[in-house]
């Protein structure tokens, strides 16, 4: 339930005073952070097609894509602060949203509509649900017609700028 608050003791049980905690840390770092970094660094452009709920880890997976197209009924949320967690492992919130909006997004844990996500620059396009697949495929086809080397070098350059701004310093 998106509106439910969670007892932190429940979450802490899985993460404190347990043998093999180092294994859990390494596993989470690999499964979440490193996986996201590898997806982000794929040389070819990637597009997230979002409809419905995009919550916590869903945001993490969408944000590593180069472009995000959302249906008008989509929403984004990250209620993990209510669980006593400071965000998902791939903590890109202040890069995807400006820092003040990222704080609002996390502190309140409320849903952000696709329209607001577009206004904040998190989403490239918002389209009717019935048009989502068509519009996404059309964009992918246009990109696929571009010279590969130019796309790869452009993506690397923009990712490098994000890294210089601190995105590469994200860690668990």
Please tell me what each predicted stretch does.
Residues 1-34:
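Glycine- (often His-adjacent) and acidic-residue-rich active-site loop
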Residues 37-151:
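Crotonase-fold acyl-CoA enzyme core
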Residues 137, 162-163:
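Short, solvent-exposed polar/charged micro-motifs at secondary-structure junctions
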Residues 164-168:
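Short beta-strand->loop
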Residues 170-172:
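Conserved small/polar residues in nucleotide/adenosyl-binding loops
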